[in-house]
Design a protein with these regions (language model features):
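Extracytoplasmic thiol/disulfide redox context detector
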Residues: 2-98, 190, 194, 227-228
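Cysteine-centric redox/oxidoreductase cores and disulfide-bonded domains
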Residues: 92-200, 205-209, 214-218, 225-228
Length: 228
């Protein structure tokens, strides 16, 4: 073998060695969303040592506050590192909750956490409609077929506009609001929370163990740390 060929062969061998020794790119757990058989959404590493489940209501101010305060530390310090898998389930307190829950679940699974966040971020805007609603409005929300009631709520609360800003067409929204199977899956999550014995929102469990009396990120975070 000539010196030139020997050098080329050694260079290729060295390149192959370096390539095989290079560390694998870290998994972007913040982009990893899975859906359980029950229809709830999980963000992060499904094999994380800690599984946090939050039961929330979209009309609940404390839930919106939890989402706001916990968002950065939960995602960056725990979910992104693959240490915590974050699951969201629904507790329905009224027809408005049910409508928003169907909208957050609308579309591909990857859209859920973005939809979930925007309805909490804008809760102060749309919740005013509930406080100032008229008797005739409330009648529209509770009479007629299921889809018609949800469409009335979506119209009165300007949810169509919120979803359009998220890239949805009105026909997409109406299809999700008419999805009875989705409504049943969401209602089953509420039934599960009642069976567990949760009495307020937000409520939490860690690795399947209910955290009764824990309602805030300040109370929750030390308990997450204790499992890591």
């Amino acid at each position: 073998m000539t010196p030139r060929r020997l050098f080329a062969a050694l260079s290729l061998a060295l390149f192959a060695l370096l390539a095989s020794a290079a560390p694998a790119a870290p998994t972007n757990w913040l982009a990893n969303v899975t859906v359980t058989p029950e229809g709830s959404h999980i963000l992060g590493n499904p094999k994380a040592p800690v599984k946090l489940t939050a039961w929330v209501s979209y009309t609940c101010p404390h839930c919106a506050e939890f989402d706001k305060v916990s968002d950065a530390p939960l995602r960056l310090a725990y979910v992104a590192q693959g240490k915590v898998a974050y699951e969201v389930k629904h507790i329905l307190r009224d027809p408005v909750d049910a409508t928003v829950a169907q909208l957050t679940n609308c579309g591909p699974k990857e859209r859920f956490f973005g939809n979930h966040a925007v309805f909490f971020r804008r809760q102060d805007e749309w919740i005013k409609t509930l406080a100032g609603s008229t008797e005739s409005q409330r009648a529209r929300w509770s009479t007629g077929d299921y889809a018609a009631r949800r469409r009335a709520i979506a119209s009165d609360f300007h949810f169509y506009e919120i979803m359009e800003q998220r890239g949805y067409r009105r026909t997409d929204v109406d299809r999700c609001l008419a999805d009875n199977a989705l409504a049943e899956r969401i209602a089953a999550q509420t039934a599960e929370a009642v069976k567990i014995g949760f009495e307020g929102t937000p409520s939490f469990s860690l690795n399947g163990a209910p955290l009764f009396g824990t309602y805030s990120w300040q109370q929750l975070q030390p308990q997450i740390r204790g499992l890591l």
